[in-house]
Amino acid sequence: MKLLEPIKVGNIEFKNRIMFPPLTTGYEEKDGSIGEQSFRFYERLAKGGVGYIVIGDVAPLSTFSPTPKLYSPEQVQSFKRLADACHENGAKLGIQLFHPDYNVKALNDMFHQGKMQEARAKLHHDMQHFVNEVTAEELDEIIKHMENCAILAHEAGVDCIEVHGDRLVGSLCSPILNHRTDEYGGDLANRTRFALTLVKRLKTIVPDMVIDYKLPIVTPLGDNGFRGKGGLPLDEACIFAKELEAAGVDTLHVAQANHTGNMGDPIPAMGTQPYGFMVSYSKKIKELVSIPVSVVGRIVTPEAAEAVNGSADIVALGRSLLTDPDFANKCADGHCCDVRTCMMCNKGCTDNIQNRAFLSCVLNAENGYETSRQITPAVTAKRIAIIGAGIAGLEAARVAALRGHQVTIFEKSLQIGGQLLIASVPPRKEEMMRSINYYLNVLPELSVTFRLGQEFTGKDYDSFDEVIVATGATNAIIPVPGKDLPIVTSAWDILAKKEIVFGNVSVIGGGLVGVETAEYLAARGCNVTIIEMMDQIAKEESSTILPTLMSELEHSNVQILTSAKLSEINDHAVIVEKTENEKTSVLEIRSDFVVMAVGARKNLPDLSACPLPLHYIGDCAGERPSNIDHAIKSAYDAACEI
């Protein structure tokens, strides 16, 4: 594979063309140094075979932002420890150098003085206006901070500096955000002056280090719109790329511009952007420069990464490496089909970062927990029965088998997948099935036995030592008058294609299942009304998918009733109590069919006579059904305890 060939970048060589791009992780210590969680995360990527690893958002001064920081000699050792670990595993390490879009000193002073309200107001103001208010003298001071950071990185043994071409640097370059009238505003030459000055000074101060530049490109959206603000449109990016090469940049990292407040622009979720949506842009840049070009953006599989050849020299895999840090090693060993591929849900990664939690992946229980979650051989090999072949049962089987247990999965239906078989049916959700295909590939290799169409019964007890129960949940029904009428069905039965509805359909419940079912039915010609007790629908949906979802509902003329409680169902309508401005009115909504999507209840088999140790995982464990993240983690942990 071309993907696995070495490549010369500046004065160093990457062992392959697989890059872990800069991502905010939330793992760093309070002072921004590399602590144990951060160290183990990046070390795991290096052990997995990644050729080039970049630490995202490294600030060159003390800020209150939850990002890595490198501004003091006391922090060098933590970065050196990581650089050494990367080198021991054949990887090169880079840091992404950036400056926040705000006046760091002013905000730090406000926070230290306890002026929280003023600080929040200042931050909000600066995020909109700092690019135009920061003085030329302050910009020069910022470059000095960045030079100091680069010197410290060099002392730590870091190989590369990636200039973050978004954030402050990208705002200055941007024709959309930059409204300055001095030497840093106006035409392209002025807007890129700071970036080029920074690059030249970095080349002077750390001549032995590779200089990478993240080149964010503003892309078209519809007829007159655009995605991203903190970057350049393609025509200007092409000119700027050649100027960056002339200034001494060793490699360019082509990416979608950000700075819109919607992380779905640079990190699009399932079905919201084509696969490899930035590859055509990297191809144009590559045609203009002689230095290596990397590209990032919805490149999911080894085959897709290999297909980038000719359009970019290096492939950046962010979410894909969170899902499977052994991506490179599996490719090198000829086991591409065993790569666990990202389903682009953005739940554990992008949403977590936006919610000020740390980076993780819902499909990889070890991600972010590399120190505490490791698969080790079992003390005693046992015969394990797993009841249920949903994603929790499948993950438990994988982990238990890797630990040396003999695993048999009982599944009463004739196919594996559980709830993901229906969760993948609504528009844009088919990518979820990749997670099931992964288990179809790896479990037979681990000698896991499947008993499809069979239930676990008393006659099986003597054949096993312990049992993992992963029987999931079932669709709940609201106990209102009329709930047993033939026009009433469940969202799960609709998505499983067990029931067909038409005409006017009322979907009871505006959670994620209800809203996705509504979109699914509207796309098939139904006139749909969503009835939700709360004041908002789809609260569980990723913020990177929600705008697309709401736009599709509006386009399909789906009616939405919030703060509305179902009280009765009759043969031709649902009766709803709608509360607005503390006043409640009764509405009758014509309905040919009523679809219940009001949550789930645990599905617990009767195992009272089973003498074996029982371990409950996934939706059938805990107080109430949960989500994929809980299913995977509970399965992993249970399998590691046996």
What do these predicted ranges mean?
Residues 1-387, 391, 395-407, 415, ...:
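Flavin-dependent oxidoreductase catalytic cores
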Residues 1-7, 36, 366-370, 447-454, ...:
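Short gly/ser/thr-rich secondary-structure transition/capping motifs
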Residues 208, 290-291, 464, 502, ...:
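Active-site acidic short loop of glycosyltransferases
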Residues 381-409, 451-459, 463, 470-480, ...:
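Rossmann-like dinucleotide/flavin-binding elements
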Residues 409-449, 520-566, 622-624:
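Rossmann-like dinucleotide-binding cores of NAD(P)H-dependent redox enzymes
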